[in-house]
């Protein structure tokens, strides 16, 4: 019986070691461009901005020098909510590091609902790439396996971070491995249709009247001939889509 207790205790110890996480607050410098054009034509002259986020690495006790894939998460117009954290926890349980980008808190903003001008999508895209640049140098992160996901406004950040005129104005060297945009605003219809060749996937609710699905369908059809982009429209679903998917 004593041996059985020892075996159980050992198994619990091994599980706990393998389930450990390290949490780091990462600070970096970004800026406050108002528009995409500010980034493309005048990035160096934009007002500088200190930004931070939280990096969580699900340490594997077996592989001491292991580098982890990473997902950078970008919240929507109300900032970070419970369902966003459930996604990050899901990724962490899969052995993927996560980075909670805090574009709002860094600027003392709680919400942009109804205005959308306290911080713009352009500034948040810049934040995401500046975070990527810092995290690419982290000893536990595999810079070739860094993806981005976001919700609503953050979904727009995720989607248009793949637009090459923006990406190349910010950083020509680093590319996100994939882009998962959850109910993004797809109202931007660029004449230049050059997007990253990394996989881009849009997930949206058919009945969503805040970020409608039709513009996303139109955009995917426009880009699909030369871009690795796809769309999933969930029938009879509104903005509560991410919560439904996690039940």
Where are these regions (language model features)?
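Sec-dependent N-terminal signal peptides
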Residues: 4-15
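Primarily recognizes the serine-hydrolase "nucleophile elbow" in alpha/beta-hydrolase
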Residues: 129-196
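Short alpha-helix in the alpha/beta-hydrolase fold that links the catalytic acid
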Residues: 212-221
